[in-house]
From Swiss-Prot:
UniProt keyword Iron-sulfur, yes or no: no
Lineage: Eukaryota, Metazoa, Cnidaria, Anthozoa, Hexacorallia
Propeptide residue interval(s): 20-45
Originating organism: Actinia tenebrosa
Encoding gene, per UniProt annotation: Ate-SCRiP
Key words of the record: Cleavage on pair of basic residues, Disulfide bond, Nematocyst, Neurotoxin, Secreted, Signal, Toxin
Protein's name in the database: Small cysteine-rich protein 2-like
Amino acid sequence: MKLQLCLLMLVLGVMYVQGASLTEEMAEDMPLDEQDVEFPREEKRHGYSHGHGNCDWPHGYCVYIKDPCSPGMLPCHNQYNCALSTNKCCCWPSGGRR
């Protein structure tokens, strides 16, 4: 079970990195006037409160709210925000300081 979870996290990490590079490549191909569109701040789009940061490295990672955190990780509760309301943040026990 632990091996399967580690492999899943590895695959998702690779997919995330590939998705980020594809997004950058697509942005380079877009005309300049489409690149300059100003989007609302992430906090406003997702209803984040100003005191909370995003759930990302080095703080933790987002998982579906009913799924358990990986071994060694703990739920952050309301400490960090995920982009989807159906997700929760799993953090390192030391709050991201390893």
